[in-house]
Curated annotation (Swiss-Prot):
Enzyme class: lyase
Annotated EC: 4.2.1.33
This protein's name: 3-isopropylmalate dehydratase small subunit
Record GO biological process: L-leucine biosynthetic process
GO cellular component terms given for this protein: 3-isopropylmalate dehydratase complex
Annotated catalysed reactions: (2R,3S)-3-isopropylmalate = (2S)-2-isopropylmalate
Function (record text): Catalyzes the isomerization between 2-isopropylmalate and 3-isopropylmalate, via the formation of 2-isopropylmaleate.
GO molecular function, one term: 3-isopropylmalate dehydratase activity
Coiled-coil boundaries: none
Quaternary assembly: Heterodimer of LeuC and LeuD.
Protein family: Belongs to the LeuD family. LeuD type 1 subfamily.
Length: 194
């Protein structure tokens, strides 16, 4: 996994609440187990019209949102069924962070396990970011180390994150990588027991 220390990127806004995992990645695209290739199906039912052409009215299809790496949405993002494919699709599309007032618990944890940073900010800060995201050139900087989000215009907001998850993200590790850190101790223990 790629470490997340500081990230500066273009912001796309999706001013909707209760975006569920079936909207993030519809069930018909869940037939694979690899973590890549899901970005093309992200928000599929919103991004494409019934004839398969891109929906020009959907936020992420607008030219000004091309290349966005930070998504700002409203409360209860990632609700619905537990599917790890949802953070896979968001990450594969190119997002490094999702900012919202609240997240569904399982989705939030699935993001952290897949190097996608979910950031909870106050509603008024999210409202400001959604308004700013209407501009084609709006960028944010996220410092995970300092636990702060800021722009070049004076906006700043801090966020909380579990210290254990923070360290894994900073190092670009998942739980398996962490196990390898303790491998010498595991081997020594096994030798002692045999």
């Amino acid at each position: 996994m790629e470490p997340f220390v500081v990230h500066k990127g273009k912001v796309a806004g999706l001013d909707r609440a209760n975006i569920d995992t079936d909207q993030i990645i519809p069930k018909q695209f869940l037939k694979r187990i690899e973590r890549t290739g899901f970005g093309q199906f992200l928000f599929y039912d919103w991004r494409y019209l019934s004839d398969g052409t891109p929906n020009p009215h959907f936020e992420l299809n607008r030219p000004e949102n091309e290349g966005a790496t930070i998504l700002v949405a409203n409360e209860n993002f990632g609700c619905g069924s537990s599917r790890e494919h949802a953070p896979w699709a968001l990450a594969d599309y190119g997002f490094r962070a999702i900012i919202a007032p609240s997240f569904a618990d399982i989705f939030y944890n699935n993001c952290l396990k897949n190097s996608l940073l979910p950031i909870k900010l106050p509603k008024e800060d999210v409202a400001y970011l959604l308004k700013q995201a209407e501009r084609a050139d709006y960028e944010l900087t996220i410092s995970l180390e300092q636990q702060v989000v800021f722009d070049d215009e004076g906006f700043t907001s801090s966020f909380d994150i579990d210290p254990y998850r923070k360290q894994l993200l900073l190092k670009g590790w998942d739980e398996i990588d962490l196990t390898f850190v303790y491998e010498p101790y595991i081997i020594a223990y096994e030798k002692k027991r045999s």
